[in-house]
């Protein structure tokens, strides 16, 4: 998708590489940097920003589960916000939310990109 940023490992030197496995859909304006690992068939919705310190919160169960640095296989991820207290008050900080698992309807929504690739069409 357009305007995607995928980081490398030039800065800082000790950083791990970004890993994006097979059949991942990366939506428009996503940024993935600082050694984040996106596992196979995950879907990153538009404007998701993932860094090594970004909280990725799975909200599909009864209680939220927080992880960092890794998007589990077949997860559907959207941008979100989380309240955080600071000395100057409470503010919203960015996070990513796992809202479900990839399914057939998700594949239909992302299939245009596959069709363009298969037919060697540049956009």
Can you annotate each of these PLM segments?
Residues 68-69, 73-75, 79-123:
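Terminal amphipathic alpha-helical/low-complexity segments used for targeting or macromolecular assembly
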């Amino acid at each position: 998708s357009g305007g995607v940023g995928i980081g490398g490992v030039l800065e800082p030197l000790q950083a791990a590489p970004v890993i994006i496995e097979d059949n991942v859909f990366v939506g428009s304006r996503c940024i993935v940097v600082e050694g984040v690992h996106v596992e196979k068939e995950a879907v990153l919705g538009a404007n998701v920003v993932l860094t090594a310190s970004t909280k990725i919160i799975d909200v599909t169960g009864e209680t939220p589960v927080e992880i960092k640095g890794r998007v589990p296989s077949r997860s559907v991820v959207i941008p979100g916000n989380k309240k955080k207290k600071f000395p100057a008050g409470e503010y919203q900080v960015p996070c990513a939310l796992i809202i479900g698992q990839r399914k057939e309807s998700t594949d239909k929504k992302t299939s245009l990109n596959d069709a363009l690739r298969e037919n060697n069409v540049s956009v």
